[in-house]
Amino acid sequence: MPRVKLGTQGLEVSKLGFGCMGLSGDYNDALPEEQGIAVIKEAFNCGITFFDTSDIYGENGSNEELLGKALKQLPREKIQVGTKFGIHEIGFSGVKAKGTPDYVRSCCEASLKRLDVDYIDLFYIHRIDTTVPIEITMGELKKLVEEGKIKYVGLSEASPDTIRRAHAVHPVTALQIEYSLWTRDIEDEIVPLCRQLGIGIVPYSPIGRGLFAGKAIKESLPENSVLTSHPRFVGENLEKNKQIYYRIEALSQKHGCTPVQLALAWVLHQGEDVVPIPGTTKIKNLHNNVGALKVKLTKEDLKEISDAVPLDEVAGESIHEVIAVTNWKFANTPPLK
């Protein structure tokens, strides 16, 4: 497993991370605790040391608690824990973010307790509170770094202006953002800005919310999956998007790998500073994901793969309408007065 630097502040992680969200049932049924811990331990055995969670995953922070229990069976000092705060409310009416200093601190304390750790390696603002100047939120995070409660600061779904202003208060180590073969809207402005500032990029949903795994193509999704209402997985949109999958499937045969491995390898090849965090509940899928690291792609290969997924042919928005307003395009904050 290759190791890379995220950001310029010294954080070193495995080139492939692991997203823990799905273990607590945010996509399908939650795994029994022992099975969830077994998946995390096997990820570590495969060389993955960078684990991603959030205070909003599972019920009442249960995903952080699960990771915390797994950490008790692993060498803590060899693991980089990334967790997130800032989603204050989530429901049918949408998502409300909160970035006030007292909320920042209380979330950090609660995450430390649930994870049962002395420090958090990477603490992200999960979604941007557009009512609070980002300098205010970052100021409190800077204090938490100085106190040793967190080591590095990250942003998620932040706009270019917010990234610049946050980074001016305290160095931002990583930006977590959706990035995959069929969601590439960060390439024009966000990626160059992160590189200019020395901020690592952590793509979530790097295999297209599972599209390139093929389950939604070859069989019907489980009724309880959140994807059954996702714009890209319903009705005519899914029928159109199946063609994208079939093109990647054909290219994967040429490269002697699975469609998932090709889609993930494409993301991994976007730069040393790009560390995707795919998640899964199954050991065999975990091994399949790790296998993407063996797929070597040339510049010509990367272009051919990109061209097989013309963005104007992708049917449906990348996120549910109710949470679209929390996307990076709407994540500016008021000026500091």
Curated annotation (Swiss-Prot):
Active-site residues, Swiss-Prot/TrEMBL: Y57
SUPFAM superfamilies per UniProt: NAD(P)-linked oxidoreductase (SSF51430)
Source domain of life: Eukaryota
The species this protein was found in: Rauvolfia serpentina
InterPro entries: Aldo-Keto_reductase (IPR050791), NADP_OxRdtase_dom (IPR023210), NADP_OxRdtase_dom_sf (IPR036812)
PANTHER family for the chain: AFLATOXIN B1 ALDEHYDE REDUCTASE, OS01G0618100 PROTEIN
CDD domains assigned to the protein according to its UniProt record, in alphabetical order: AKR_AKR13D1
The protein's name: Perakine reductase
